[in-house]
Amino acid sequence: AGLPEGVFNVVLGAGETGSALVQHPDVAKVSLTGSVATGKRVATMAAETLKKVTLELGGKSPIVIFDDCDFDSAVNAALAGNFYSTGQVCSNGTRVFVHEAIYDNFVDEVVARSNGIAVGDPFDPETQMGPLVSQQQLDKVAGYLSEVRSADDVSLLCGGDTDFDAPLSGGYYVSPAVVVTDNEDHSVVTEEVFGPIMTV
């Protein structure tokens, strides 16, 4: 790219590598995209050397749908905002607020369309949603789904299946899930799942 040697470096590694970079006195700026817990640790370490810090931490990006919306476009936006890249995008709109006048119709339509999403091999042209990135991520998403299934104040309306027949068996697949709740404090409502779970 024409940059002088040492101007741009890519250093790969896990937490230990990140800690070394954050604590190093010659590093002037740290930018992190990650969890809230990791962000707190990075900010604390960076404060020791007064580094500039930019943090983009896990949370829920909202989609707000009013009763005067173009209904079909709103449903499409919610589906794309939740299930694009199997929900593994930081900016996915995974917390959907819907005006009460259209709430029931919206939920019914989202559930019907979610049930129709073709989950499969990303190389198959018929596939609309592929797998999660790893077993670790599948386990994390399955953990959220387990919490939802055991909660009295949260309802799983569709999806959340991880048991697929061959050739998908053994893969990191989960069907698109739609969850409804009034509990604003439940983990599936407040935390970034990074998987195909829409919360309405």
Annotate each language-model stretch with its function.
Residues 1-18:
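PLP-dependent aminotransferase-like
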Residues 4, 26-27, 49, 193:
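Short loop/turn motifs at secondary-structure junctions
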Residues 6-9, 153-155, 199:
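Conserved beta-strand segments of alpha/beta enzyme cores
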Residues 29-33:
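Periplasmic-binding protein-like
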Residues 35-184:
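ALDH superfamily catalytic-core signature
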Residues 189:
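Short, solvent-exposed loop/beta-turn-alpha elements that line the ligand-binding surface or hinge
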Residues 196:
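Glycine-rich nucleotide-phosphate-binding loops and adjacent flexible coil segments
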